[in-house]
Swiss-Prot record:
InterPro entries: Cytotoxin_Cobra, Snake_3FTx, Snake_toxin-like_sf, Snake_toxin_con_site, Toxin_cobra-type. Negative results: does not affect blood coagulation and does not show significant hemolytic activity. The keyword Protease does not apply. Keywords: Cardiotoxin, Disulfide bond, G-protein coupled receptor impairing toxin, Secreted, Signal, Toxin. It comes from Ophiophagus hannah. This is Beta-cardiotoxin CTX27. Disulfide bonds join C24-C43, C36-C61, C65-C76, C77-C82. It is found in: Secreted. It comes from the Eukaryota. Expressed by the venom gland. One of its GO terms (molecular function) is toxin activity. Its main location: secreted.
Length: 84
């Protein structure tokens, strides 16, 4: 009986996937990340090209990945902390 109850609990947790949300980096440091709000299930890294200085990088969560342009390179991904 205990085995059946334990099996049901494990199956319930696996099926419900309790508390899962995407985690994305929001700084260049790999240990600092943010938990994305509901609906924002992609991580993004935007590189803004400024001359003559180097690139400014924006990282975080996003719902829809925008297209890259001549001034902004956009990289989107679908796994945790993938926007390095």
């Amino acid at each position: 009986m205990k085995t059946l109850l334990l099996t049901l609990v494990v199956v319930t947790i696996v099926c419900l996937d309790l508390g899962y949300t995407r985690k994305c980096l929001n700084t260049p440091l790999p240990l600092i990340y943010t938990t994305c709000p509901i609906g924002q299930d992609k991580c993004v890294k935007m590189t803004i090209k400024k001359l003559p200085s180097k690139y400014d990088v924006i990282r975080g969560c996003i719902d829809i990945c925008p297209k890259s342009s001549a001034d902004v390179e956009v990289l989107c991904c679908d796994t945790n902390k993938c926007n390095k």
